[in-house]
Amino acid sequence: YRRVKLQGKVWRRVQDLKIPSLPRSDFVTSRPPLDLSHNESTRLAVDSLLSGGLGKYQEVLQTEGEVDFLSEQEKIYFLENGDNSNTDNACDGSDTGSESLCSSHPPTPQCPTVSRDSDSTQACLNSSQDVNDSSQSNESNVKVYLYTENRAAGLKDVVREFIRKAEKLLAIVTDHFSDVELLCDLLEASKKRFVSIHLILDHLNLSIFRDMWQELKLQGKDFPKFSVHSVEGQTYYAKMGRKLSGQVSETFLITDSKEALAGSFSFSCLSWMVHRSLAFLVKGSAVTHFLEEFERLSSCSTPVTG
């Protein structure tokens, strides 16, 4: 008997798109339901990439009749960041210790239920209660800031003004931090205005912040109200015993539990000078969502010392 060649789920969709389209009225009438079912072929391919490399990945794609759905950059990320897994739950409550600003290979953070390494999580828990009491009944108010060529570093000015407004608490999450001027703004707020600063950084880009800190010859003991944590993104566990942790690709700031500033910017000179970004300022009850996200990231974070 002739063996039937498998056709992958994505491959079938691509081939279907090559067929001449029906009139719009016919398509609207016969519109198929959105298929959100699991694609086992892509899972097998990803697991094979993690455990056996590009060769095994291509082999599974050919066997399953599926298209190559990963970009070259994504493949490199899988190969460089895949790790052996003990199949333990990432949120197992284990003590992960702390990272050092001087260490070259920071440990992989786990995800305890509540972080007891610093007061950042508890501070935000208290702040969340404050915002629930003070602004839950308020309507959300959103203001959008877009990049404009006639206002140099406009988004950076917005961020700096937002930092300056903080009186008691400033919680920050960012994927990339290399801007010395913004670091000075934060340290001045912490040391001179006694604002509690809680900074969470992406674990893979932590070395960028560490290098800046060391280059400036700063000492953590001189800034007791300034805490730094690192955190991973989601963790994918392959059935073949490998795992892959993602990155934090979000940036937002919360000041005094009253306002949140979020957007596509990073804390870097390139972000302000040449990259096109946007930001939006949120007030009212919607700030609660940012506080809850900060608490989730805090519970999975690893403190950085140095």
What are these regions (language model features)?
Residues 171-172, 181-193:
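Amphipathic alpha-helical interface segments within eukaryotic helical scaffold
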